[in-house]
Design a protein with these regions (language model features):
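A structure-centric signal for secondary-structure junctions around beta-strands
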Residues: 33, 57, 78-80, 141
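Residues embedded in well-ordered beta-strands
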Residues: 35-37, 83, 150
């Protein structure tokens, strides 16, 4: 059994990674915010709730705050992904308490496979959020939060009514 560790992030944390070598997380971990993990290439193994999910291009995992998880490369030499972690506080800048409650009901833990068109659109949303974090100045924080909400709403759209592997 792997050890568990808390992995804190700011209200919004986004990272693109293209890794050309094996990488196994040394410990299980959790965050105090949501995580959205989008596979863009290669292969990665996500362990959550005693289930191993094989993630390849187009696979998206949604995890809630404090969901314990970890990932491994196993036999895969390469993987490419975007990961986004965010707190409800980041969304509360633009959403009402009732809107947050409704979103909490809709943003459920799952692993879904997106078709190529959905994958490309989701990638565009990730790039937009990432791009706004590289800018500063007048209204930059509002742009960051607006792009985040757009991405989250597309995640909800992609996971509603789809065949998901429930977590």
């Amino acid at each position: 059994m792997k050890r568990k560790a808390f992995s804190p992030h700011d209200d919004i944390y986004i990272q693109y990674l293209r890794n050309m070598e094996k990488h196994d997380m040394p410990v299980q971990h959790y965050h105090d915010g949501y995580e959205i993990f989008l596979m863009l290439g290669g292969k990665r193994y996500l362990f959550y709730d005693n289930i191993c999910f094989t993630l390849e291009r187009g696979d998206m995992a949604v995890l809630r705050p404090f969901d314990i998880h970890y990932a491994q490369s196993r036999d895969a030499e390469y993987y490419e992904r975007f990961v986004l972690n965010f707190s409800e506080t980041a969304l509360s800048a633009l959403l009402s308490r009732e809107e947050l409650r409704l979103l909490r009901e809709k943003l459920v833990p799952c692993v879904v496979h997106l078709n190529e068109e959905q994958t490309e659109l989701m990638l565009d949303f990730f790039k937009r959020v990432n791009g706004y974090f590289e800018k500063s100045g007048f209204l930059s924080e509002k742009l960051q939060h607006t792009a985040l909400i757009q991405l989250v709403m597309y995640v909800v759209e992609c996971t509603q009514g789809e065949q998901t592997v429930g977590l």
